[in-house]
Amino acid sequence: MQESQTKSMFVSRALEKILADKEVKRPQHSQLRRACQVALDEIKAEIEKQRLGTAAPPKANFIEADKYFLPFELACQSKSPRVVSTSLDCLQKLIAYGHITGNAPDSGAPGKRLIDRIVETICSCFQGPQTDEGVQLQIIKALLTAVTSPHIEIHEGTILQTVRTCYNIYLASKNLINQTTAKATLTQMLNVIFTRMENQVLQEARELEKPIQSKPQSPVIQAAAVSPKFVRLKHSQAQSKPTTPEKTDLTNGEHARSDSGKVSTENGDAPRERGSSLSGTDDGAQEVVKDILEDVVTSAIKEAAEKHGLTEPERVLGELECQECAIPPGVDENSQTNGIADDRQSLSSADNLESDAQGHQVAARFSHVLQKDAFLVFRSLCKLSMKPLGEGPPDPKSHELRSKVVSLQLLLSVLQNAGPVFRTHEMFINAIKQYLCVALSKNGVSSVPDVFELSLAIFLTLLSNFKMHLKMQIEVFFKEIFLNILETSTSSFEHRWMVIQTLTRICADAQCVVDIYVNYDCDLNAANIFERLVNDLSKIAQGRSGHELGMTPLQELSLRKKGLECLVSILKCMVEWSKDLYVNPNHQTSLGQERLTDQEIGDGKGLDMARRCSVTSMESTVSSGTQTTVQDDPEQFEVIKQQKEIIEHGIELFNKKPKRGIQFLQEQGMLGTSVEDIAQFLHQEERLDSTQVGDFLGDSARFNKEVMYAYVDQLDFCEKEFVSALRTFLEGFRLPGEAQKIDRLMEKFAARYIECNQGQTLFASADTAYVLAYSIIMLTTDLHSPQVKNKMTKEQYIKMNRGINDSKDLPEEYLSSIYEEIEGKKIAMKETKELTIATKSTKQNVASEKQRRLLYNLEMEQMAKTAKALMEAVSHAKAPFTSATHLDHVRPMFKLVWTPLLAAYSIGLQNCDDTEVASLCLEGIRCAIRIACIFGMQLERDAYVQALARFSLLTASSSITEMKQKNIDTIKTLITVAHTDGNYLGNSWHEILKCISQLELAQLIGTGVKTRYLSGSGREREGSLKGHTLAGEEFMGLGLGNLVSGGVDKRQMASFQESVGETSSQSVVVAVDRIFTGSTRLDGNAIVDFVRWLCAVSMDELASPHHPRMFSLQKIVEISYYNMNRIRLQWSRIWHVIGDHFNKVGCNPNEDVAIFAVDSLRQLSMKFLEKGELANFRFQKDFLRPFEHIMKKNRSPTIRDMAIRCIAQMVNSQAANIRSGWKNIFAVFHQAASDHDGNIVELAFQTTCHIVTTIFQHHFPAAIDSFQDAVKCLSEFACNAAFPDTSMEAIRLIRFCGKYVSERPRVLQEYTSDDMNVAPGDRVWVRGWFPILFELSCIINRCKLDVRTRGLTVMFEIMKSYGHTFEKHWWQDLFRIVFRIFDNMKLPEQLSEKSEWMTTTCNHALYAICDVFTQFYEALNEVLLSDVFAQLQWCVKQDNEQLARSGTNCLENLVISNGEKFSPEVWDETCNCMLDIFKTTIPHVLLTWRPVGMEEDSSEKHLDVDLDRQSLSSIDKNPSERGQSQLSNPTDDSWKGRPYANQKLFASLLIKCVVQLELIQTIDNIVFYPATSKKEDAEHMVAAQQDTLDADIHIETEDQGMYKYMSSQHLFKLLDCLQESHSFSKAFNSNYEQRTVLWRAGFKGKSKPNLLKQETSSLACCLRILFRMYVDENRRDSWEEIQQRLLTVCSEALAYFITVNSESHREAWTSLLLLLLTKTLKINDEKFKAHASMYYPYLCEIMQFDLIPELRAVLRKFFLRIGVVYKIWIPEEPSQVPAALSPVW
């Protein structure tokens, strides 16, 4: 009831107000009066009925609505502004409060609803510019209410009409308030239209969700839930939630919906199904609509009033729509306009045409009429924005320009507020492609700044929200507009500025930047947008060709800054994109004990914060169901990029030389080899130069013809007009200039055309088509070439083609139509190609600003044509768009553009002093370094770091006095990079640390601390400038060269100090220090690089001969302290570098430097040793190695002394913690042991003595690994001949070490180390005894006699004392060491030294060896007897009589001492040994040697045979070296000139003779025991003298020698030796001639040589053995052989004796005859018979010689025995028989 009364009140008052108007009373308004009166009467009647309660509240019906609306319609049609205003106001309120819904059918127009008629009536109230301003405002209010009201629905044409009317009011109204209100209303309407469309989909999604949530899911519902439509709707809902507005937009991230728009969206979001109406209304709906209207109108009026008189008031709306392009305000729009009727009519007609023509088609594609509404409005706005501007300079107040601007602004608003449906629905995407993008291609090159600016803003929005669907359109916009404007030299500053402002936003979005690279640069068919963009920005940032652009220097600088800002943003995006790969060293630690402080964390976040604040990554836009997406595979894209580069290079080659390009592409596998493949390539690849394509196809070569045929055959001319076919044929290339080439092409074209159109009847043959095609080409040239003045007429053309159709004419109408078509449009290449070529060809230098503008306008026009053609070409195309997600894209991106980026930053830093430019360049370099670091791109990283270092001026050759603020900032940046990217810097640390080093020097010089660096050495006299040259050369690298070399005055110094003053600030000093303190947080590889380059810089600092600096050396010490707590693996790698550096520094020729190094080493070592060391680790060994190196290489006594003292201090204070370090300690002392400085030797020996005697007592297990080094060290002390007392004491300590090994074998056995291949049982030997004994042998071999004798004694004492603990195989090793003593004899040395060695050491050693062997025979005989025999043989064979005698003596002693333990095998070996010695020492040369050239003297045949009674052993023997074993040929001519050779030979022969004699004696002593034979001979003599043999009886039965232990075979071997020796000596003694020759040659001396002693002793020994065996019952089995041997030997001996002429010779044989006869007499009768019968004749002969009485007595006994045995004589009385004749058995 209340509602009805309210409505009645509105209507009544309005009608009464209309009737009351005096205008209504005029006659022409009679119908209006009647309608008003009728309506009032009905209202009164209705109210009366309601008051009386006679009827229920009436429901709205169609007839009633008609009655109510008719007076208002008539009122609106009246010409009275007041009446119209009143009517409109009432309608607006009725609609706003829901009193009119308009759902009733329109009685006057079937198929329409009343609301459509109402809206049409409201719109008709606007009659153009002359419409009353109040009426205009009421129209705007009414229409906004109609669109926004929740009570009514208007769609399609009606809603389009409301928008059009407001649009026209904005254009036509002269009132600023109305204009602003109309514009705001338009924005609000669009907001409502598109919001309702989005909310409708949300509503559907909610309705789909309700049954799913409330009921158990059936299979059908489940299928629906996962259907694409449902998923899309649900996704759309999620995307449009107001709770997630954080998404960053390319349009500066603001949300363009106005507050009023939000209100209307929230309160008007109850969409209904098609055609439905609301059954009820919200209580507050009317108030809400009222508020909206009041807000819109009030705010519009207020803003217009505030800005009255200012330019472009609609920019307020622009601000609401988030446009932020910093271009100065544009033009005034307050002027009056004309021609609105035309404009409105064109709008209406266009839109009506669209609505009528496409109504059903469009509606069929939309799921709701709201979507169609939005589509129609959007399309209309696009078409409005495409309307061309008038000719000439654009008028800011013209309808065309204002229409274009507002349409673009509204489009921008729509796009910025686009919801999920608009962003994903295929119809809207297609609308954007077909209408908006084409519109942008025209407006995007507009010369009007506002239009251009809006176009850019729209493009930004498209790029932000729609790039998934607009891949190819975005490419066109970039390639043909953005980049062309940047590249064109004639572009205006305003256009460049706006483009680069837009690029600033694009480049600040990481997702967008990476997407551009992935989708264009990595697409085979797309342009390299990213690469080209960066290159263009780089050129702008470098400020090239600035003066040619018509810009002021300030404008150029602004542009440079923006270019740099874009480049920096791109790198920031890359950093942001790859941030997950970055490890900040300041947020971790490599030391377990350390943690970051809050201050350090804060300090380290600089770059991170800057990076994070740059821009957040864009979210991926939602793709529609029809959009193709590609999987993001970085490796695949990289492969594509490589292929693309190959193709581009091939195209580049083709455009120079086609065949070469084709060949290259085929070689790379990018192009097939068949002609069809090549033809297809020519068709598809638009980047090919069209002229080159034409020339290639027209060439006469066979291959070219085949390609051309394939090219034409791939064209389809079916059912095409001839001219159209020809156009298609010629659009892909430019016709070549040669007529023959054209002829070939036309011939093939004609053939192909006829082939495709075989059913045609126009052409008689292909010849006709060929001639006609040729004539068309000629016609095109004639009509369209500016060179042709007189153009061909149609008649002339027809005449020219007479008779070409098989001698007949083609129809004139046909030829005429061809002429007209060609006249209207020439035949040319494809428009995109033609325009692109035209654009590129117009680039030229301009002479004036006017010329530049004209040329630029021409270029912009061509650009627009190209862009429009390309946009239209791709409007229906679909291209897959990849939304990049992988981090790995950044690496190839950066690799592609790092060089132009570096060029831009370098030139910016070098040429521009602007602080903002420098700041941008430095920030860019920082980001570039970060990227290069993260992806391990060493070349790129090093290049950027070197650039920073270069611009710091710290390493440049220019004077450091030129340092400016940018250079200071560069230094700070370099320090920051070191701090934040240290983990990745690698070799780049070199540049950074070099700069830090030079920075420290600059600080010192700048603060006056070290001005001596500028004036040479401080030792020079004052005022001298001689040092300048040196200092200048020294610090050229610092940039001090120019400052120094020219001398230093006060002004220069002041300037210098001022320039480097800031580098000495606390912040810089702290930052530098933080690099070193922060080294603990570098990872394991980075710290090694850091240390390596710090050491390299330190070496450079120390390289100065005059002023070495120790800054870096000090830092090395510091970081060693800081990093000492790292894990051992890392620390060992660090110390490997630092230790090597200390090696070099410790040997620095400058003593101060070396002292500092050694002292630093000491401090570090003490700290390191405090940590201790676990078993089997070797870190101490590595750490202390520099001391060892310094001792080895540095000969400075000061440094060596200091090193020894440092080690001594460590030993005294840290002995308990030292493990593997003992090796280095002993190595250092080993070096000191050989020093000539007594103090060094004494100090080292004292510490060594302390270690061995004291520390080993307590820490022996820890030092086992170095025990060998300790012994070696002592050995070195012992070998220092300059300090004999130390030598003896050292040997004593070695003996002392043996005590440790003996007492602690278990410790040695249990010790495990690197030599794990040593068996536990052998460790005592390998680590204990062997080193001791080996070093003693070294002492023996190296030292002088007293020391080596002591060493020899100690060595054998140790053997004898501890040998019982040795294993058998240890003895083998030991004797190899012992035998090394004799190895010294094998070296060529001085004769005197060798002789001394043989007679002392070797002699001593031989006897000692035999003693040890005897002592430990059981252990040694199996393993070492052969070696000992071999060694004895070697000694015997030496040319040293003493050694030879000692060898035989030792052999004798060895056998006598141990023979009773010998096995038969050992006796075999022993006998073989003696046999070998015998054979090798027989001096056969004595019998054969002859002096060369000496003739035999016959007088010498009868020589005096008197011999001296002295034995051969008394012959004068000269000391000799080991001589030759063989004599040279007697015929050698060199004998006369080489007497020394003879002496050497004779000495050797003498020694052999001595050895033979010694060996005979040795055999005798071994078999019968020493002195037994002599005693026996003496007894025989006595017996002979006494004429009795009784004394011999007891000797026969006592065998003290080895006889009883030797087998007969062993004895036979010895007998062979003896017999051979006897035979040789007998032969020599009998050869008087040879003896004379030798005597004359100097052999023997004064008397003739003889071997009488050898002759007799060998035979005597032989006889004794044989006779002993002959009577030995145990050898009965060998008696026969013995007897045979005995008979032979004795017979030969007696026979020889008879032949001897010399009395002295016979005298020497006396004892032999006594022995022979005496022994024979002692055998039994049976055996005696055999002997007597053999000897008898010889004995009879002997009787004739003058014999001594003893021999005659024995002969007498022998003959008496013969008589008895042979019974010649029988004694009468036994008592009378001589004792000799009594039987012995």
From Swiss-Prot:
Changing residue 534 to W: Abolishes interaction with PRKAR2B and impairs TNFRSF1A release. Keywords: Acetylation, Cell projection, Cytoplasm, Cytoplasmic vesicle, Cytoskeleton, Disease variant, Endosome, Golgi apparatus, Guanine-nucleotide releasing factor, Membrane, Phosphoprotein, Protein transport, Synapse, Transport. It is found in: Cytoplasm; Membrane; Golgi apparatus; Cytoplasm, Perinuclear region. Gene3D superfamilies: 1.10.220.20, Arf Nucleotide-binding Site Opener,domain 2, Leucine-rich Repeat Variant. SUPFAM superfamilies: ARM repeat, Sec7 domain. Residues 2-224 are annotated as: DCB. Residues 654-785 form the SEC7 domain. Residues 1514-1532 have a biased composition (Polar residues). Expressed in placenta, lung, heart, brain, kidney and pancreas. PANTHER family: BREFELDIN A-INHIBITED GUANINE NUCLEOTIDE-EXCHANGE PROTEIN 2, GUANYL-NUCLEOTIDE EXCHANGE FACTOR. This is Brefeldin A-inhibited guanine nucleotide-exchange protein 2. It comes from Homo sapiens. The lineage of its organism: Eukaryota, Metazoa, Chordata, Craniata, Vertebrata. The gene is ARFGEF2.
